[in-house]
A protein has these predicted regions:
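Short, basic-rich loop-to-helix N-cap that marks the start of a DNA-contacting helix
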Residues: 49-63
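Conserved hydrophobic/aromatic packing and binding residues within compact polymer-binding modules
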Residues: 18, 32-33, 43-46, 72
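Short, charged recognition helix plus adjacent turn
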Residues: 3, 71-95
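Short Asp/Glu-rich motifs
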Residues: 41, 52, 65, 81-83
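A short, Lys/Arg-rich alpha-helix, primarily the initiator
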Residues: 1-24
Length: 95
């Protein structure tokens, strides 16, 4: 997927925030990966390259690290809005 410069900037900010939140919780990349049932290389890639809401891992990281998907200013297309609504519904019912 080719990202606009604005979306690329948002994805990179997300990666920086993931790293800061993970380190703030005292977790290693491997530790966070175990919690999320994924590979540490996926966490490392998310921190280095960032992610967009098209990735399931984007929302899993938001859930685990207390990040808000809306804070990253991604283009508000219908798919994105539906994913945000789904995430909101899930987090409100599970907490």
């Amino acid at each position: 997927m080719i990202l606009s410069s604005k979306m690329r900037e948002a994805a990179l900010k997300f990666g920086d925030d993931v790293k800061a939140a993970r380190e703030g919780l005292g977790l290693t990349q491997m530790g966070l990966a175990k919690i999320l049932h994924t590979y540490s290389s996926n966490v490392a890639s998310a921190e280095r390259k960032g992610l967009t809401p098209q990735s399931k891992l984007f929302f899993e990281l938001c859930d685990e690290l207390g990040l808000e998907p809306e804070d990253y200013g991604f283009q508000a297309d219908l798919v994105y809005l539906a994913k945000i609504a789904e995430w909101r519904k899930k987090t409100h019912y599970e907490r």
